[in-house]
């Protein structure tokens, strides 16, 4: 049987083309070229076979994620019901925003869903780093010392602390001291070292849950709980703060549910389901949240001021969908790990290892192989799929960075995205995928891009 496929949309215009289809196999069209038209995509049969094998291999772990999704979605449903969310909470406010009921109820939903005493959820936070900065400046005072027990923080936070940059406006300039306990050589926390490093002089013990641009394991809630217990034994009055970016709803509990005093994250990552246009949250002890609110606005007014400009509906909607969307992103990561491990690349975590965030690192070994992977992820995006990512400088980083992010919200990392500093070990850090089907396709297109560039031996 011979069929001819004509007309396709490309780069916003219609183009005619003809591919001779020689066979219909299992719902897909096999072309003379040896490629399978995956209905709408030109993917090599060998890549498709590898993808099928990867998904079969990962099936038990995908099922476990589904169970966590279900639990966390029920928890979120309960939080909405207990807070009494109603349509009236979607009403916009302007000006000072006094009496914004939706804003206050959204805070309650976050506190309940995250297992915290209180929470502060605002679209006014412009990034995860900004949210963390408000929390740090909100609770630390001149002369205080913070101790990071997970080694060097993420690149963009180093300028906030005063480790890099000219120090202008940093914690260091305000007389707040910084100390650091490195991780063990295998990237795990140095619990024995904490027993001596943490002392009553430390006002804050700081934990970065996610790996950032490193290959160390992200921290599970159980590991964070162990750190909390050591910190509270060694320095009972210290504040244990967690950078929870990329970690929300990955497990059934959050750090605040196991004793962390404060944690923060970005709404364009896990907590708002790919719907929030911007924002962040801080959750934890009620007295600390009040201090953070005073830092965000002004002492005395705190959380009682700040209009929402019609954003409440999107924030409520995204928050409700977040547990399910996070699970879809996790499934995408597990599938990608299984697929690229099958191609012979080192991945972390492996498909069968416990996960504490949505990030999947794939070591591509070579600069151009890395670029091919990133470009393939971009090709699988619903927005700007025709864009070809190129390495370029980026504020806060010490080398060129290449990024794929064809997202509806600029910079959203709960939507399928990938980024990588152009330095050894030439690893791509991929995250997101608001539904598994589209995320799976993105990973397959990344593999096809690498095959086309000559970096897969099949």
Regions found by a protein language model. Give the residues of each.
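Conserved PLP-enzyme active-site core in the AAT-like
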Residues: 38-59, 66, 75-82, 86-89, ...
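N-terminal small-domain helix-loop-helix segment of the aminotransferase-like
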Residues: 94-102, 106
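Conserved C-terminal alpha-helix-loop-beta "cap" of PLP-dependent enzymes
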Residues: 341-458
